[in-house]
Amino acid sequence: MSIRKQARLEAKQFIDSLTVQPFPNSQKVYVQGSRADIQVPMREISLADSLVGGSKKAPILEPNEPIRVYDTSGFYTDPNQPVNIYDGLEKVRSGWIEERGDTVLLEQSNSVYTKERLSDETLDELRFDARIQARQAVEGHCVTQLHYARKGIVTPEMEYIAIRENMGRAKYADEELNQQHPGINFGANLPPEITPEFVRKEVAEGRAIIPANINHPESEPMIIGRNFLVKVNANIGNSAVSSSIEEEVEKLVWSIRWGGDTVMDLSTGRNIHETREWIIRNSPVPIGTVPMYQALEKVNGVAENLNWDVFRDTLLEQAEQGVDYFTIHAGVLLRYVPMTAKRVTGIVSRGGSIMAKWCLAHHEESFLYMHFREICEICAQYDISLSLGDGLRPGSVADANDEAQFSELRTLGELTKIAWEYDVQVMIEGPGHVPMHMIKENMDEQLKHCHEAPFYTLGPLTTDIAPGYDHITSGIGAAIIGWYGCAMLCYVTPKEHLGLPNKDDVKVGLITYKLCAHAADLAKGHPGAQVRDNALSKARFEFRWEDQFNLGLDPDTARAYHDETLPQESGKVAHFCSMCGPKFCSMKISQEVRDYAKGLEENGDIAIKLLDNPLEGMQQKSDEFRSRGSELYHPVQEEI
C-alpha cells in the first residue's frame, strides 16, 4: 500500500472511531451567562492537595483550587456530548441568529458553481449529507457584529466572549495564584475584567473582530483584538499532490484539540468545495479561506484567466457554506510590483504572486482592488470578516521592511476604512521574515496606517538558516510581535518551506505558538495570564508531578519525557527527577532550607542564640547531619 493510501486509511479510521477524549484530570465545565442558552465552555484542571505538615500516617493536606483554561476543543473533549463527524456539531448560535429577525433562508444557492456541484451525482459519495440551509441578510439589512456594536447592541456573542476571555479568574482566592508582574503593554488597554460592554466597544471601534458567519452556527464565539488574549491560527488544507477529505477533517479535530483558535482551509487540490463543507460543519472555531485559491482552480490554474465574475461566484459559494473570514490580497497594486524586482526572494505570497501576475498580464489594477466595495457588500450580507492579505510580505530577512511591504500596508489601511463604511469587520495580515530588531517597526506602522485594526502575522521568522525548525525561528518573532500588540499569530510548522504538514507537524506548530501567545500575554500583563504559571510552579516545587503534566500545554509529551527515565509509579511522587537525581535537586534543598528557616522564625530564642553565636549553631547542625549518616535525602519510600 502506498504512503498516500495508508495516510488516508488511517485518517478514515480516526474519523469512524472518533470518541470523546478529555485531557487528563480535566473536565469540561460550562459557565452560564445572563440567559440559559449562553453556555461558555472552559477546561477545568483538577489538582492534588499540597502536603503542608504532619507525618506519614497523619499528613496535613491543603487543597489546591482547580485551574480553568481557555478551551477551543468544542464537544470533542466533552464526554457528555455525542460526537458524530457525519452529523456535524450542535448549532449553538442558531437561536441567536434567528431571533434577530434580520436574515432569510435561501430557497436556492446564489452561486452558479454550488448549483453545479449539487447537481453532479458523481460527487454523492464525497458530499456531507447534513448540510444546512443557507441564509443571508434581509434586503436592506446588515448582519455584522460590527453593525450591532455600532448601534449599541450587546449581542449574545459578545457576552459569551466576555465570559470566555475572563476564564473564571474572579473565583481564585489564593494570593499566590493571583500574583502577577505588571507587564509592559505598549499602549494597549487591558482592563482588570472583560465585560460585554467592553467587547462591544472594542468591536465598534474596529480594534477587535468577532469572525462569525451566520451560516456557521456551530462556531463558539471568539474575539481577535489587541486588548484580548493573543490568538493562534492553524492552517490545514489539501494540495494537488497530497491529502484527502478524511485527512483534513482529522487535522481540524487535532488542531482545535491543541489550541487552534481559528483554522484556515488553504486547500488547492481536488474537491475543495466538498472538503470545506465537512470542515465547517464539524468546526467549533471560525474557519478562514483564501478564495483566490479556489477561483484559480476554476480557471485551470491560469492566473491571467481570472476575472471578477469567477471570483464573485466563489465568494458567494463560500459565504453560503459558512466561511467566517476571507483573506483578500486587494492591496497588491500594479505600481508596487516593480518594487519587488530587487528583492532576494521576490513575491512569496501565493495570493500576492497570483494578483501580481494578473496585474502585469492585463496592465491594470487588480479586480480585487477595483471591486473592493462589492466584496464588502457581500461580506455584510453574511457577516464575513475580511483579513486583508499582505501579498507583498517579505520572504527573507533581507527583504524585511522594504518599500513594497510598507506601500501595500498603507493601501490596506485605506481599504480598512472602506470596509468599515459597510460595517464589515477587518483585520490586517503581516509578515513574514523579519529580524528581531526590525519587528517593532512593523507593529508601529500597522497601528499608524491601519487605524488599530487587529494585526495577524505569520511569525515573523527571525532568521532563514533553519529549514525543519521554522516553528522555532518564527516562534521567536511571534512572541515578540504578540507582546507589541499583534492580535493573532498564524502558526508555522516544522514543515514550513519543505512540505504539507501532517498531523504530528500540526501539533508541534500549535503547541509552539500557544506557548508564544501565552508568553506575549504575560509580557503585556494581561489580567490573569499568570495564574496557570503560578499553579504549575507551585506544583513543581511541591513535586506534584501529575499536576505538572496536566497543567502544561502538552500533558502527553511532558509525561512521556518524564517516564523515559523514571517510568515507575514511585517516580510520580519522587522528590527529584532524572536531571539532577536525588542528591542534587535544588528544589528539594530549597524546601529543607525553607522548613529550617520557618522553624527558626517560630522559635525566637533559637533564632537569637544562633545570631549571637553563628559558628556554634553551624557546628551543631553539622554534627546532626553527620549523626544521620551524612544522607542528604531519605529514601523515596520513606517520604510522606
From Swiss-Prot:
Residues bound to substrate: 235, 264, 293, 329, 349-351, 390-393, 429, 456
Entry cofactors: [4Fe-4S] cluster
Pathway: Cofactor biosynthesis; thiamine diphosphate biosynthesis
Lyase keyword on record: yes
Alphabetic keyword roster: 4Fe-4S, Iron, Iron-sulfur, Lyase, Metal-binding, S-adenosyl-L-methionine, Thiamine biosynthesis, Zinc
InterPro entries on file: ThiC, ThiC-associated_dom, ThiC/Bza_core_dom, ThiC/BzaA/B
UniProt: [4Fe-4S] cluster binding residues: 577, 580, 585
Cofactor note: Binds 1 [4Fe-4S] cluster per subunit. The cluster is coordinated with 3 cysteines and an exchangeable S-adenosyl-L-methionine.
Catalyses which reaction(s): 5-amino-1-(5-phospho-beta-D-ribosyl)imidazole + S-adenosyl-L-methionine = 4-amino-2-methyl-5-(phosphooxymethyl)pyrimidine + CO + 5'-deoxyadenosine + formate + L-methionine + 3 H(+)
EC number of the protein: 4.1.99.17
Transmembrane regions: none
Family according to the record: Belongs to the ThiC family.
Task performed by this protein: Catalyzes the synthesis of the hydroxymethylpyrimidine phosphate (HMP-P) moiety of thiamine from aminoimidazole ribotide (AIR) in a radical S-adenosyl-L-methionine (SAM)-dependent reaction.
PANTHER family for this protein: PHOSPHOMETHYLPYRIMIDINE SYNTHASE, CHLOROPLASTIC, THIAMINE BIOSYNTHESIS PROTEIN THIC
UniProt name for this protein: Phosphomethylpyrimidine synthase
Native organism: Photobacterium profundum (strain SS9)
